[in-house]
Amino acid sequence: MTTRTAHRKTAIVYRMVTDAHICPFGLKAVDLLERRGFEVEDRHLASRAETDAFKAKWDVKTTPQVFLGEETAQARIGGYDATRRHFGLSVPDPGAKSYTPVLVVFGVAALLAGAVMWGLTGELFGVRGVELFVAFSMALLAMLKLRDLRSFSNMFLNYDVLARRVVRYAYVYPFAELAAAVLMVAGGIWGLVAAPVALFIGTVGAWSVFKAVYLDRRDLKCACTGGGTNVPLGFVSLSENLAMIAMGLWMIAKAI
């Protein structure tokens, strides 16, 4: 036996692959092992009956299942998350709160604003670039809210002071935010039309977030990126509303 053969790292992955379903975590497990230098024996479970029989044999509830070296109980690592832990890699907590969704929105908005400015003026930003950044951010956030308006309204009603008095406002808010954003992008007189809308929803929103977080000390999730997300209600949420207030005031100041 050569030294290379003796030190060869092998793994066996059982994963569900049928005409109706291909397990994404199985693909990720195979990819992870190959990137770690393993020769992977990729075994497909081609039917529900075959999958159920495999799970019964090994007394497991899910697939994929990863075995390192040989197919024994001692060599079984578990599923994709267990394999990541085995190699010392992090496993995301689906219930953990994170600002990532809203920061991604701000990042994409900045890239769009910079690209538009570069195409029109040869500069990356400038005053108009900042205007476009805020407007694009508002439009993207409104889009995320509108993709599931019911879920958004459920979260929004937890803290917005006006929506708790006038429930229909929770359904109007995303449309108002989107309209203000589009008008700001149009600029000129349309920016002035957008100003009172942005001022109103931004002021109500800023007070609502400030009251819930800093006065009432409530630990809530923010509806800024739509319902069903784990963005914490806090400073980043407040910044969305403060930006709308600033844009509303700026649009009025430009027209004077």
Where are these regions (language model features)?
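Local sequence-structure signature of Cys/Sec-based thiol-disulfide redox active-site neighborhoods
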Residues: 2-44
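Thioredoxin-like thiol-disulfide oxidoreductase module
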Residues: 43-62, 83-93
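Residue-level "edge-of-site" marker
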Residues: 46, 68, 169
